[in-house]
């Protein structure tokens, strides 16, 4: 099946973070592609990737970048697809703040949906939710996933009670 989500990153050094987006999309059974597209080192590749994405069948692009983190915004500027930005705390970043602010502070007309620092898993979930608006099977998988999160927390609450931690809520 052709990919529905593109996962791109500025460098292969970002793969350890962006892997989480791929993992959650696999869990939901959503076909996707993963590659390196640098806004600074391969600008022509970036433009070609973004401008051909829709015609290639992609519905959402997840773009991760560290440092100056121009990739998500530049991709968003040349595609009509939703772009989800993942700020990455890199070796040359200012504790990740430069990446966060570069992706968050986009001008009017060029939105980038932004997740937390290194939160590629949430980017994958958000991409799945976007796809789920038009696909009931994906929507149900997301609902099941969220139910499992609820169950997991309630099991931990019960374990805490068994371990002697009391509260007046339960």
Outline where the language-model segments fall.
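Glycine-rich phosphate/diphosphate-binding loop of Rossmann-like nucleotide-binding domains
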Residues: 2-41
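C-terminal binding/interaction regions
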Residues: 3, 9-16, 20, 96-170
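Proline-centered loop/turn at the N-terminus of a beta-strand
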Residues: 4, 82-87, 110-111
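Amphipathic alpha-helical hairpins
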Residues: 5, 31-55, 64-67
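Short beta->alpha connector loops at strand-helix junctions that form conserved
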Residues: 9, 36, 65, 86-89, ...
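Short glycine/serine/threonine-rich phosphate/pyrophosphate-binding segments
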Residues: 14-18, 42-46, 65-74, 93-97, ...
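Short, solvent-exposed amphipathic alpha-helical segments in soluble enzyme
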Residues: 21-26, 51, 78-80, 129-131
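Helix-adjacent hinge/juxtasegments
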Residues: 52-98
């Amino acid at each position: 099946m052709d990919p529905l989500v593109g996962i791109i990153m500025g460098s292969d050094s970002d793969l350890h973070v962006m892997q989480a987006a791929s993992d959650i999309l696999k869990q939901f059974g959503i076909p996707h592609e993963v590659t390196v597209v640098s806004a600074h080192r391969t600008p022509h590749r970036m433009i070609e990737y973004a401008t051909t994405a829709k015609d290639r069948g992609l519905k959402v692009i997840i773009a991760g970048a560290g440092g100056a983190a121009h990739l998500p915004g530049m991709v968003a500027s040349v595609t009509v697809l939703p772009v989800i930005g993942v700020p990455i705390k890199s070796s040359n970043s200012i504790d990740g703040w430069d990446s966060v602010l570069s992706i968050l502070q986009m001008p009017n007309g060029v939105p980038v949906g932004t997740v937390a620092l290194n939160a590629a898993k949430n980017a994958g979930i958000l991409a799945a939710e976007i796809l789920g608006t038009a696909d009931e099977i994906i929507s149900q998988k997301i609902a099941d996933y969220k139910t499992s999160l609820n169950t997991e927390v309630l099991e931990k609450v019960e374990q805490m009670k068994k371990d002697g931690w009391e509260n007046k809520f339960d």
